[in-house]
Amino acid sequence: IDAGLTFPTDEMPGIDTVIPDITYLKENREKVKAVFLTHGHEDHIGAVPYLLRQIDAPVYGSKLTLGLLSNKLTERRVEGDLREIRDGQTVRTKYFSAEFIHVCHSVAGSMAIALRTPVGTIFHTGDFKIDYTPIGGESMNLNRFAEIGNEGVLLLLAESTNVERQGYTMSEVVVTSTLRKLFVENADRRIIIATFASNVDR
């Protein structure tokens, strides 16, 4: 699940990117049946081109996630068997199945993944934000989260930026109304806004 990269610290002169150690995967490449992507941020898909040079496996992700990945593969001249999935879709292999569930995040097409194995369910949330009024209009499927929880989960792998902070993250709707207000108040001035390129809604 996911294969991201990060950027070097000041203590790493001459290094452009930092990718995971995939030695185990290379040594066990016949066991790798698929690559599942939760969303299209660099820290989750950035190392996929390096992985696919070593591992021959289909890559599953949402339409936008695969679109972002496709550009990276083209840049690095790497071929990939990319397979689009949708919310609620299940991918089955001989040994396990993977159900994809929509979650809200700062990039569209984000998914959680419920892996059903012979020993139990492993639930990977991916990055998420509980937003009851998302810009795209599609709320996180918390009902499905509850159903899977009631079925029984062997292991929960949960991630969320700023999870250690108290309180709630504001809805994207609040950001939109704030931006509109700033545009109205500064109609005669130049406005420069920095944001992540992958945050299509903003």
Named regions from a protein language model:
Residues 1-36, 41-202:
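His/Asp/Glu-rich metal-coordinating catalytic cores
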